[in-house]
Amino acid sequence: TDCLVLIGSHLGENMHNGQVQEVSTAIERNATIITVDPRLSTIASKSKYWLPIKPATDLALLLSWIHVLIYEDIYDKKYIEQYAIGFEQLKDHVKNMTPEWAYGISTIQPDVIRKTAREMANASPSVIVHPGRHVAWYGDDSQRERAIAILNALLGSWGKRGGFYFKEAVKVPSYPHPKYPHPHWSWKDNLDGKYPLSAMGITTELLKASIPEFDYKHQIKAWIVAGTNFPLTIPNKELFQLAAESVDFIAVVDTMPMDITGYADVILPECTYLERYDTIRSAPHREPNIALRMPAVEPKWESKPSWWIAKQLGERLGLGSYFDYDDFSEVLDWQLKQMGTSLDEMQKIGIKIFPRKSGPLYLGDGEEYSFNTNSGKIELY
């Protein structure tokens, strides 16, 4: 890409090594980096533009960028005409959302908003406005993500070289475990239709279900907490504290002492990713691929891999028949053999690349394409 916009992302301070390497390459060839972050993060310090935005006001900035692209007539007209609908409604919607309007909300100067919008337009379609990771912390974050998607559409980025390529993943076959019984209830049963679009458990609702005063249909009496540090990840500390005091029992699975382990009745020490096998990695990418995470050294002291912890608990709860293997490597070897490889081969090569089956990475000039929407178009409004 020639222009990368990071809003809700702090590459360089997390474990996404592949992305960091690619961003480093982009910096070396003088790609423009625009970083929106209240603090001077690592990537902000490497950026051409750092926009120290007021927290929780991203949406105002995004809408003003959209306004500039449309009303300065610097969006990708040809792309929008072919692949999008709802442009006139969008144009009317953002009419008054000027950089001056956004400045009063976001504290970003109007001239900086205009300058950065023009940088994006100049790089179009080789521009990416990164959607961020784990960004749903505020009430309007779904709309925030929509605004980012709309911005990328106006820049002609979807399906274009230097923008967003069409990704593809390899399907990993499921190991033939015995069929699990259906749970008597799930977290959704407590919500009475709230949050219908949520596909995963809503942590704050699980905490509320642990507190008798909320009078939820299904009360939670115990927690097994794995891979999360509630005291630092739940914005409402008071809610967490009350929930932790309300449950009868807390078990924590973690690789090291954390804030949450101080609340545990029992701690089950998990070994680190360098000491265990994990499930086969198959993520959407340019080239479909699978990756094997395997142990480099034996686990230290009493720590164990998560599969071992789950299997031991299952056996003690009378559920041992659902863990019909002695070692998780048996599961991995079976799955890999269905995919034309084996655990032995993957231990040697680490990553295996497969041929694409879904077509080219990018749209050709003027190529017909149907997006995964009701209309088959990018729906701007």
Model-derived regions: residue spans:
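Surface-exposed loop and adjacent secondary-structure segments within mature catalytic domains
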Residues: 173, 178-186
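Short, intrinsically disordered, charge-balanced linker/junction segments flanking boundaries
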Residues: 375-381
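Cofactor-pocket helix-loop regions in the catalytic cores of large enzyme subunits
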Residues: 1-169, 190-296, 300-369, 376
